[in-house]
Amino acid sequence: MISKITIPVVLLFCFSTSVLAKSTLNIDGNSLYHGYQLYEKGFDYLNVRDEQTAVMYMSFVAGVAGTLSKENIICNESITIGQEADIVGNFLQTHPKERTKYSPSELAMIALGKELACSKNSNS
């Protein structure tokens, strides 16, 4: 009985959350970099809103990295989410002009691809 109610409610919640996110969030390379800067400060020093932004940054990077890994574009089973976040953040920091040139997904793909490409790791 509970599962018959729970599944539609969860699906509705997921759908409504994604629609809301699409309508209210405008993420670009600079806002992605801002998330990295907050992540770098450490969660002990952030207010709730900044903590959410830092978590969003880490989650975004983890999602892109997970997708690239599943498609065998990047390879490194021992890397942590924090290391992936650092790779993308360092790229954003050292390439400020790229932040407005590419989408956040493209920026993360470029950064992770440069450091963790399967072909690069197999030649080492």
Regions found by a protein language model. Give the residues of each.
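Short, compact, well-ordered microdomains
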Residues: 86-123
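N-terminal signal peptide c-region/cleavage motif recognized by signal peptidases
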Residues: 14-18
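Cleavable N-terminal signal peptides
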Residues: 8-9, 19-20
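N-terminal leader/targeting signatures
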Residues: 9-11, 87
